[in-house]
Amino acid sequence: MGRSLKKGPFVDAHLIDKVEAVRATSDKRPIKTWSRRSTILPEFIGLTIAVHNGKQHIPVFVTENMVGHKLGEFSLTRTFKGHTAGKKAKK
C-alpha cells in the first residue's frame, strides 16, 4: 500500500539541505547519504547521489525515470554469487 497523497513524499531534511546547497554552488561532487528511505524528487534530476548499501557508497546518477522511487532501490545491498552446480543423484 502506498503513502497517502495528502502527506506527500518523504525526504530526509538533511538531504534536501545538501541538494539545495549543491544547486546553489553547482558542485559536481556526489552527495553522500545514508538515507535509503528518501524519495527521489524532481529537484534531484542531474545530480549524483552516493547511497550507502551497508558497506560502501554507490554513486547513483538521478534521471527523470527515477522520480518517485526510493534511493535504496538503486543501491543493492546483497550480491548473488549463484547456486552451486551440485552433483547429480547416482542411480
Swiss-Prot record:
Organism: Dechloromonas aromatica (strain RCB)
UniProtKB keywords: Ribonucleoprotein, Ribosomal protein, RNA-binding, rRNA-binding
Name recorded for this polypeptide: Small ribosomal subunit protein uS19
GO biological process, one term: translation
Disulphide bonds in the chain: none
Lineage: Bacteria, Pseudomonadati, Pseudomonadota, Betaproteobacteria, Rhodocyclales
Gene assigned in the entry: rpsS
Role, per record: Protein S19 forms a complex with S13 that binds strongly to the 16S ribosomal RNA.
Gene Ontology molecular function terms on file: rRNA binding; structural constituent of ribosome
Similarity field: Belongs to the universal ribosomal protein uS19 family.
CC terms in the record's Gene Ontology section: cytoplasm; small ribosomal subunit
